[in-house]
Regions:
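Carbohydrate-interacting regions of secretory-pathway proteins
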Residues: 20-234
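Bacterial Sec-dependent N-terminal signal peptides
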Residues: 1-21
Length: 234
């Protein structure tokens, strides 16, 4: 019985310690210059795309996690108040069964652009096995959506947390999924323009031309969760 009580106590302590470590920076991260983009309690620093100062009720915070609820009426991508140029960004995400979402970056916010993807490239978030997009070779989790297929697929099963990392540094883009680099390309050269011309974004003249912009969490109509959102200016 004593062993059981001790085991339960250790498990409880471990869970409490883990919860306390969510949405925080380590001493090493602080020294390196990282900053939190999500405080774990509020959506301060974020708003609904093209609605400055407004956060749709589809986005809520519970237990240190940003949650998307597709049943709510006030919809739209959640986007940072600030713009970033040359940065190291990371976020943990969890997708629902058959779900689809994404992390869209270098976004220009302007009423003439109806969606974040009119200007910003996307790192795909997907249930590869359950969503129809999983059958499209460059629409799977970790892909640079509709542009570059991931070099490998270290994605975890639906319901588990994944870590996405996007590094934009003076024209060089690197995407990491669960610590593995899965995409590397330049976003300032002729090859980039050629890729766009061969993609579904070819008729969007403002797509992929920004060297800086906002970062968005996509409302694609399916439940999705985000936490531990951090960025470092390079």
């Amino acid at each position: 019985m004593k062993k059981l009580i001790l085991t339960c106590a250790l498990m409880t302590f471990g869970l409490m310690a883990f919860a306390q470590s969510l949405n925080t920076l380590t001493a090493k991260e602080k020294k390196a210059g990282f900053q939190l983009l999500f405080d774990g309690k509020t959506l301060a620093g974020w708003h609904t795309y093209n609605k400055p100062g407004v956060i749709g009720n589809c986005w809520t915070v519970e237990d240190g996690v940003i949650s998307f609820d597709m049943t709510k009426k006030e919809r739209g991508d959640l986007i940072t108040d600030a713009e970033f140029e040359n940065y190291d960004f990371s976020v943990e995400w969890r997708i629902s069964k058959n779900g689809n979402s994404g992390i869209i970056f270098n976004v220009t916010e302007d009423l003439k652009y109806g969606s974040t993807y009119n200007t910003g490239p996307e790192m795909q978030v997907l249930d590869n096995d359950g969503h129809p997009d999983g059958k499209i070779f460059n629409h799977r989790s970790g892909d640079l959506y509709d542009l570059i297929k991931s070099s490998s697929e270290p994605v975890k099963p639906v319901g588990e947390w994944n870590t996405a990392r996007i590094v934009c540094n003076r024209g060089l883009l690197q995407q990491y999924l669960n610590g593995v680099k899965v995409v590397e390309t330049r976003y300032d050269d002729a090859n980039w323009k050629t890729m766009i011309a061969g993609s579904k974004f070819k008729n969007m003249p403002a797509f992929g031309i920004n060297m800086k912009g906002r970062i968005a969490l996509q409302d694609h109509g399916n439940p999705v969760w985000f936490r531990n959102i951090k960025i470092k200016k390079l």
